[in-house]
Structures are given as C-alpha cells and as structure tokens.
Regions:
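Small-residue-rich packing faces within the transmembrane alpha-helices of Major Facilitator Superfamily
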Residues: 5-12, 72, 98, 155-159, ...
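Hydrophobic/aromatic residues within transmembrane alpha-helices
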Residues: 54, 59, 80-82, 86, ...
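Specific transmembrane alpha-helical segments of multi-pass solute transporters/efflux pumps
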Residues: 16-61, 103, 186-204
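Transmembrane alpha-helical segments that form core, pore/gating elements
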Residues: 9-12, 74-76, 80, 111-168
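Helix-helix packing/entry segments at the starts of transmembrane helices
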Residues: 2-3, 48, 62-69, 136-158, ...
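Hydrophobic transmembrane alpha-helices of multi-pass small-molecule transport proteins
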Residues: 12, 37, 86-108, 161, ...
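Juxtamembrane helix-entry segments on the extracytoplasmic side of multipass membrane proteins
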Residues: 1-2, 26-32, 91, 106-129, ...
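Hydrophobic/small/kink-forming positions within alpha-helical transmembrane segments
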Residues: 40-45, 49, 71-76, 102, ...
Length: 256
C-alpha cells in the first residue's frame, strides 16, 4: 500500500515537472473522475488484494491459474462491445496462454489446485479485477497520458487500501537493506512494471496485452529456478512453449 502511494506520487511529480496543467485536467469531467476512481479502487487496489487473499487461502499456483482466466473475460467483453467474433489465431493464442499458465502453476498436476469456496471466490474476483484493470483506463490514457493516469490510480488505490489495512501499525526494522529493497519494489516492481504494461494496453489494446502478460509466470518460473534452486520439470517446458507460442502468434497477427 505504501509502495503504491509512493510510486503514484513519484509518477505525478514527473507529470507535474513536465506538464503542470495536464496533471489536474483529469479531474475536470465527472465521467473521467468516475473512471479514474474505479480504476484506482477496483483495477489497481482490488486486483492485487484479491490475488494475495487467494494465495493466502490456497497457494500461489492456484491463485495464478484463477487470475489468468482474465484474458478470457477481456476477450469476451471486447468481442461483445465490438460485435466481432475473435479471430481463430486469437482464440488459439488464448487457449495456449491459459493452458501454459496452468501447466507452469501446477506442474501439470491438477491435485496441486487447492480450491475451496473462499479461494474460488477470491481467485475469480482477482480475474475480474484484472480485467477491469485492463479495460477501464484505455480512454483515459489516450486523453491524459499513461503516467498521469497510472500515477493517480496508484495514489487512489494506495489510499483506499491504507484505510482498511493500516500499514503504519506494522512493526519492522528499517536498515539499509530494507531501504534498498523498498526502493527496488517502488521503482522496478511498481513504477516500471505498471507503466510499461499499461502503455502496452494503450498501444495494442487490453485483449492482446493481457495475453502478452502471460509471460509473467514464465519469468517467475525462471526466477524461482535461478534464485531459489527449484527444479524445472519437463511439463514446465510444455507450459513455457504454450505461452511463448501465444505471444509469437499475437506478434505475427499484429504485423499482419
């Protein structure tokens, strides 16, 4: 929560330094304000909160599989809104991405999915929130810029979570390592990751961007192998191939 607020303030200061007037233009129209608040609360804040609660009530693999059903929700919504059936290559890419995520998260063993009613509710809620995170800010970013929208969204989401979670009650020891770790989370894990992804949403649309984001479990798997010494199983290679195949298909589709 504190990271979100800090990251939001840094982004807004960047916007203020370059274009002071544009920073507050987003608050002029009621419709824009409503979308921004919905994005900050349900897109930014609730997306992460629901995912971590799903992890807490089950495990990371189960929560990841449930959250990455979001591309299905996004593709269905975009199809209905545009009154257009997705292309076959898009549907195949969707199957490969979701299937690949399932294999990486569970290693192909369905018994690794610990799904209680509570987990199912929070996991699907995180998928819906992830879809909203992709769909809500599209028009806002085109009008006001990615940095401006993400900055306000992070600040709103961070304040919203602070009201309920109260991070200032958390007791911890601050040393140089804590400061460096916090700086890395804010600069790389929050500002860089969120802004680059949302710029991708602005450029290619929510449906394709959410499928490209399926590369995240691939990266997480490699990090686990490199830094934690986890074994990379054969089924993981199949999941990896499925996700990368989906990304390649979408890349070729974009070129066409």
């Amino acid at each position: 929560m504190a990271c979100k607020c800090a990251a939001g303030l840094i982004l807004l200061l960047t916007v203020w330094a370059k274009q002071k007037k544009q920073m507050f233009e987003i608050w002029r129209e009621k419709r824009d304000v409503f979308q921004l608040i919905m994005f900050g609360i349900f897109g930014m804040a609730f997306c992460q909160l629901s995912y971590y609660v799903a992890v807490e009530t089950s495990n990371a693999g189960t929560a990841t599989v449930l959250q990455y059903t979001a591309p299905i929700i996004i593709m269905l919504y975009v199809s209905v809104r545009n009154k257009k059936v997705p292309q076959r290559i898009e549907m195949l890419a969707l199957v490969l991405a979701v299937g690949g995520t399932f294999l990486l998260a569970t290693h192909g063993n369905i018994t690794n999915l610990a799904i209680s009613t509570e987990t199912l509710v929070w996991g699907l809620a995180s998928a819906v929130a992830m879809a909203l995170y992709n769909l809500i800010p599209g028009e806002l970013m085109k009008k006001f810029g990615t940095f401006n929208v993400i900055g306000w969204g992070m600040l709103i989401g961070g304040i919203f979570l602070c009201v309920f979670i109260k991070p200032w009650h958390v007791i911890g020891m601050w040393d140089i390592y804590t400061v460096l770790a916090m700086a890395a989370v804010i600069l790389v894990g929050t500002i860089l990751s969120f802004t680059t992804y949302m710029e991708g949403v602005r450029l290619i649309g929510a449906s394709k961007a959410s499928l490209f984001a399926s590369v995240e479990p691939v990266t997480a798997t490699f990090m686990t192998v490199v830094f934690m010494g986890a074994a990379f199983q054969f089924v993981d290679f199949i999941g990896l191939a499925g996700i990368l195949g989906a990304v390649l298909m979408l890349s070729l589709l974009k070129k066409e």
